[in-house]
């Protein structure tokens, strides 16, 4: 069903109406391969069909959908929430007043301090949202076309603006591992230690770790082989030395009867969330006295990849270990190769001496 663009009594309510429609559209078009709680998703869809009263209510529904397993919804909703809040300062009376020039002005204000990767997320979300509006609004058998493409938005610096990921040094990693050994998470100590160790020693994504099932783990001599459901419904395997997690895995597996059961769940039997795992990492970093700009669990993956490349100098190995589709994605970790920088400095000195 199509609706007039200015379907509510004022700009704010009309924009909120369309944003809720868009979120509902994304919930039912994004990949649901990681969906863990269909009932929760059904409840969110029902609530969106009834309509929301304010942006906070819509925010809560988006978070509920993410916790149900549709993590991609926040990639679209969070940037649009910021745009919505900022546009309200302009005191517009109609959505038809929005044009590309205004959107560029808004994005310049709210993304100035963000990385290029985050700016690209904003660009994708904004273009996708207004494309949705182009196709869904109709009044007197005509649609208002925004045609927002942001081709000339200068907010993204390109390849030279790549931001290097945060990672721990070997010394910091030792402190972090000591913090794991001494950590006390009450009834969740064994489970929490196990998931963090698997991530840091294999470099898998948090989304991959929380979806590991008992049946995904097999043994081969002194190794555990873990079958991972990766991006794009693809599968790969990672390996970890038994001695690193043997006791923890043995204690956790005692409580599992079915090999189809997820390894990491809470006391209600529902899967752990990515945000929960990141909070564990933040606590451990704090206890270890390690301060980083980004303290989330993804930093463990960057640490694994960086130290692996520094040790082996093998970019293909990093690509295979991390499950990157492209070698260019793995190339970011070569920026931390001080040996190459020292060699360049030596060559420069030799040139000056000649």
From Swiss-Prot:
InterPro entries: CB (IPR044068), DNA_brk_join_enz (IPR011010), Integrase-like_cat_sf (IPR013762), Integrase_catalytic (IPR002104), Tyrosine_recombinase_XerCD (IPR050090), Xer_N (IPR041308), XerH (IPR033683)
Residue span(s) of domain Tyr recombinase: 163-346
Keyword tRNA-binding part of the UniProt annotation: no
Biological process annotations from GO: cell division; DNA recombination
Activity regulation, short description: FtsK is required for efficient recombination.
This protein's GO CC annotations: cytoplasm
Location in the cell: Cytoplasm
Residues forming the catalytic site: 205, 231, 298, 301, 324, 333
GO molecular function, one term: DNA binding
This protein's UniProt keywords: Cell cycle, Cell division, Cytoplasm, DNA integration, DNA recombination, DNA-binding
Core-binding (CB) domain residues: 48-134
Signal peptide: none
PANTHER family: PHAGE INTEGRASE-RELATED (PTHR30349), PROPHAGE INTEGRASE INTD-RELATED (PTHR30349:SF64)
Described function: Site-specific tyrosine recombinase, which acts by catalyzing the cutting and rejoining of the recombining DNA molecules. Binds to the complete atypical dif motif (difH) site and to both halves separately.
Similarity section: Belongs to the 'phage' integrase family. XerH subfamily.
Protein name: Tyrosine recombinase XerH
Organism name: Campylobacter jejuni subsp. jejuni serotype O:2 (strain ATCC 700819 / NCTC 11168)
